[in-house]
Amino acid sequence: MKAEAEIIFVTYPSPGHLLVSIEFAKSLIKRDDRIHTITILYWALPLAPQAHLFAKSLVASQPRIRLLALPDVQNPPPLELFFKAPEAYILESTKKTVPLVRDALSTLVSSRKESGSVRVVGLVIDFFCVPMIEVANELNLPSYIFLTCNAGFLSMMKYLPERHRITTSELDLSSGNVEHPIPGYVCSVPTKVLPPGLFVRESYEAWVEIAEKFPGAKGILVNSVTCLEQNAFDYFARLDENYPPVYPVGPVLSLKDRPSPNLDASDRDRIMRWLEDQPESSIVYICFGSLGIIGKLQIEEIAEALELTGHRFLWSIRTNPTEKASPYDLLPEGFLDRTASKGLVCDWAPQVEVLAHKALGGFVSHCGWNSVLESLWFGVPIATWPMYAEQQLNAFSMVKELGLAVELRLDYVSAYGEIVKAEEIAGAIRSLMDGEDTPRKRVKEMAEAARNALMDGGSSFVAVKRFLDELIGGDV
């Protein structure tokens, strides 16, 4: 009898990456009975001390998914590096984890060989953890990169090393309108919508180093769907054997309640009861993600914009935890009283339930890829307001490349400190909620197409089958 399979996930331990990786692991377990166990290796991050509790809560009802915590990294990079060049910090901290992963994997593989009933068949590696490819090679295990971003981002990662061979310097923000012929995009991509880290020397070098390791993987699993990014996936399908095959395995979504230390049941019930009382498609939801912290001046401009438009709204405001300020303290005087009949302000909302509600009509979003996929899944159009990471590129893709969103901003970066004025915000909200050009019908069509992709015979269903057949062998 052939031994059952164990797959090892090496996941970057930030909440967003853990959430998507664990959800993907759940989908594989549900899909294939030959998988005995998926073991997820993770380590502690100084900036995300609660991540391990979050991960445990996500797998609590999953006996075939096992979390394996690694020892603390010795001599981690200084936190100052994170605030200057986050991608450089992430890469350096991951490199320091390589010996710990090597020891853990060696022990796992040896113990499985001794048991004879279970075999480790390969690694699924978060794209921030690509230094682990060398460990997989040492143990003669295939490694697959799991990209929590989209195929457009992968196109950029393919382009970066090619550009670097010609021009070794980081990108220049002052040449923001210079366009790049990034493969997989129909539109040329302006410099100003590329990830902000590419304008900082240390982060730029980290991005290039990460991208240069991609060809060492046996395959790349992308959390996107063919019907959404047809041009990008077609481009990768045409590539020769010098680049790994690309598998569109998305959308990988966590559609059940996610635990949050900031939201108790009464808060959640208050929000959902309020939504029940609102007319269909009347609410604009404003949220910039768990890390989308905005200051008092920007909060005041958004508040003024909401009063200018008169639209009903649900506004989730994340404040700096070190300041211990309530979001209500930062609002203009009298705002809550003036908007009491039309709006609700909270510090955290159950986003999946909110987007699924019939009262939702639009979403002003930071364009984190998880949020984009969730909004598309529920057919809710977006107004783009990116903040950090690759969100500017996501916003560009949604507005210019795919025609699936309304532009508020494409190139906004929260770290630069610009204050977007109320009139501009109000204009985007009006376009989102009332405009004839809002791609509401196309978004609804994409929601249906994404669901079809996951069904038996759909593009993502077939891609996951190809991946599992290659990894485990035989028929699923």
UniProtKB/Swiss-Prot annotation:
UDP-alpha-D-glucose binds at residues 290, 349-351, 366-374, 388-391. Pfam families: UDPGT. It is an enzyme of class 2 (transferase). Its EC number is 2.4.1.-. Keywords: Glycosyltransferase, Transferase. The keyword Nucleotide-binding does not apply. One of its GO terms (biological process) is negative regulation of systemic acquired resistance. InterPro entries: UDP-glycosyltransf_plant (IPR050481), UDP_glucos_trans (IPR002213), UDP_glycos_trans_CS (IPR035595). Transmembrane segments: none annotated. One of its GO terms (molecular function) is 4-alpha-glucanotransferase activity. Belongs to the UDP-glycosyltransferase family. Possesses low quercetin 3-O-glucosyltransferase activity in vitro. This is UDP-glycosyltransferase 71C3.
